[in-house]
Amino acid sequence: MILSDRDIAWYIEKGLLRIDPLLDDTIRENGVDLRLDSEFCRFNPDAPELDTRKPFNREIYYNCVKVDPEQGFTVKPYEHVLATTMETVCLPDDLVGLVNVRSTFARYGIFVPPTVIDAGFCGQITIEIIGSAYPVRLYPGQRFLHVVFVRTTSPVANPYHGKYQGQRGVTPPRPD
């Protein structure tokens, strides 16, 4: 079942769902909007082959910057970048979050691959952004993502306790 604005407010009021900071315009009709933070990471086109079984070195594969909210960050045509949300989101054991880009940004040609926030997860959300056919400037603080919460039929037996639990900022891959 997809939660309505009233359901989301109830979960937050009871302390079961945490979104921090929670602004007045965060809760929408059937989900929440999350804002872009100021950190963006570009993939380094000159990086060597990435071996997914070896430790990942962020400095080799990404060029990360903190951007001024007034200057923004330009996503180049068809470029893939990583970003993160300003908000920390903590889900209880009976909610799953389905993340998508807000339709305004989709209409600009921006794409975000489907992302799931697992039941029991707590942290900022790292997302991949794929650029449009033309450069698009994004700004920290913009409501960029929409998260729809789905209630599971029963609380999950094994809430998320994985390698990304508690992540802050843009979090690179952590090989198994």
From Swiss-Prot:
Quaternary structure annotation from Swiss-Prot or TrEMBL: Homotrimer.
PANTHER family the UniProt entry points to: DCTP DEAMINASE
Phylogenetic lineage: Archaea, Thermoproteota, Thermoprotei, Desulfurococcales, Pyrodictiaceae
CDD domains recorded: trimeric_dUTPase
Family: Belongs to the dCTP deaminase family.
Xref: Pfam families: DCD
Pathway: Pyrimidine metabolism; dUMP biosynthesis; dUMP from dCTP (dUTP route): step 1/2
Organism: Hyperthermus butylicus (strain DSM 5456 / JCM 9403 / PLM1-5)
Enzyme class: hydrolase
Protein's UniProt keywords contain Methyltransferase: no
Protein name: dCTP deaminase
E.C. code: 3.5.4.13
Molecular functions per Gene Ontology: dCTP deaminase activity; nucleotide binding
Reactions performed catalytically: dCTP + H2O + H(+) = dUTP + NH4(+)
Gene Ontology biological process: dUMP biosynthetic process; dUTP biosynthetic process
Gene3D superfamilies linked to this entry: 2.70.40.10
Keyword Chloroplast: no
Binding site for dCTP: 102-107, 118, 160, 167
InterPro entries linked to this entry: dCTP_deaminase, dUTPase-like_sf, dUTPase_trimeric
UniProt KW keywords: Hydrolase, Nucleotide metabolism, Nucleotide-binding
Active site per UniProt: 128
Record's function text: Catalyzes the deamination of dCTP to dUTP.
